[in-house]
Amino acid sequence: MPADLVIRGGTVFDGSGQPGIVADVALRGDVIQEIGPNLVGRAELDATGCAVTPGFIDIHTHFDAQVFWDRGLKPSSYHGVTTVVAGNCGFTIAPCRPEHHDAIIHTLENVEGMDAKSLAAGIVWDFETFPDYLELVARRGTALNFTAYIGHTALRLYVMGDAAYERAATAD
């Protein structure tokens, strides 16, 4: 049975560290069916002179808020990235109680250099907890695989309230 798509004649790098090889890559759906010469597919993409690689994983992004107004997660989706991880810097939007939306927006405004009004207009606040945030992102969908860490700033504010700005955390 022919593949759905054959990526023909590109230099295939498999991620193992071995040198690339010129080959065809046959796909059925989104699964690689075969790598080799002269493969047959219903559609073909000429990759002569191009690198064919596994999708890249960007382990440090700031898409926490952007995921709501840019499901394509640009520019990562333009560069072969297939999975993004948000929340590395500790400045995230979840978890967040409604009374702290402005504080989280202000933090992002300072860190990301974005206008607070634009952030407020773009963020969909249909969540409070971190699992609710991840569920909302999944339900809305993204062009890339998306995952995130819980940001330190948002977590402190969620647990300690405004005291997060005043004192160190304690076991209490």
Give the location of each predicted region:
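Short capping/connector residues at structural and topological boundaries
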Residues: 17-18, 57, 68, 160
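Residue-level signal for pocket-adjacent positions within structured domains
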Residues: 8, 40, 63, 150, ...
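Divalent-metal coordination cores built from histidine and acidic residues
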Residues: 69-172
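Histidine-rich, glycine-flanked metal-binding segment
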Residues: 1-55
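Structured core elements
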Residues: 6, 26, 58, 85, ...
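Ser/Thr-centric signal marking residues that sit
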Residues: 11, 61, 82-83
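Di-metal (Zn2+ and/or Mg2+/Mn2+) metal-binding site signature of metallo-dependent hydrolases
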Residues: 51-75
